[in-house]
Regions:
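Positively charged n-region of N-terminal signal peptides that target proteins for export
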Residues: 1-6
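Boundary at the C-terminal end of the N-terminal hydrophobic targeting segment
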Residues: 24-26
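Active-site-proximal loop/short-helix segments
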Residues: 82-90, 130-132, 141, 158-177
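Catalytic domains of carbohydrate-active enzymes, especially glycoside hydrolases
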Residues: 56-82, 158-163
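Loop/turn elements at helix/coil->beta-strand transitions in domains of secreted/extracellular proteins
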Residues: 29-32, 68-73, 116-123, 159-163, ...
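Active-site-adjacent "subsite" loops/lids of carbohydrate-active enzymes
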Residues: 28-56, 108, 112-113, 122-159
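Bacterial N-terminal signal peptides
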Residues: 7-17
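Aromatic-lined carbohydrate-binding/catalytic grooves of carbohydrate-active enzymes
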Residues: 68-103
Length: 177
């Protein structure tokens, strides 16, 4: 088994070293991204802020991301069947507003505008099934699929995001392994 693992690693290294010979194209398509999790919103100065404070702090975040050589940001817009934007499908995220009520401005609209002003692509990062630490939406349910599709449509019809990113399929479990 070790022999096969070594051969596989050697083969992958060889393939990666060959490249495609078109460095200009490869460089222009390279993605250097960072994920901004809802669990970091408070520390980053995005939670329970006025619009001006939110905008100033988001601007600093994007300036830092760009200064560190990144060109893409994956921003957590839906973590627990909630939304960081006004939604007809989901409640407002407690990670932006402690009371779960809209703050009187549209955080995602601001984020998209500021990201693009820093020449960053911004992807809406969603956890499609997670409702809480112990509850998930039923992945086999047509109602769940319709709910997720409606949330994606809501985002792509209202915001100039550069992509939708589904991630972190957390399922309740009692087994840590």
């Amino acid at each position: 088994m070790k022999h096969y693992s070594f051969l596989l690693i050697l083969f992958m290294a060889l393939c990666l070293s060959l490249g495609n010979g078109n460095k200009a194209q490869a460089g222009s398509l390279q993605t250097k991204g960072v994920w901004v999790s809802c669990f970091e919103f408070e520390e980053l100065g995005l939670k329970d802020k006025t619009e001006a404070q939110f905008r100033a702090n988001a601007n600093k975040i994007f300036a830092t991301i760009r200064a560190n050589g990144c060109n893409t940001v994956y921003f957590h817009v839906r973590a627990y069947d909630d939304a960081i934007y006004p939604s007809s499908v989901a409640g407002f995220s407690k990670y932006i507003s402690s009371d779960g009520k809209a703050p009187g401005y549209d955080p995602l609209k601001i984020l998209v505008s500021l990201a693009h002003s820093h020449k960053l692509k911004i992807h809406a990062w969603m956890n499609p099934y997670r409702v809480s630490s112990t509850k998930i939406l039923d992945p086999a349910s047509e109602m769940t699929t319709a709910r997720i599709v409606n949330q994606v449509k809501e985002i792509i019809n209202r915001y100039a995001v550069d992509g939708i990113h589904f991630d972190d399929y957390f399922y309740p479990t009692v087994d840590e392994g």
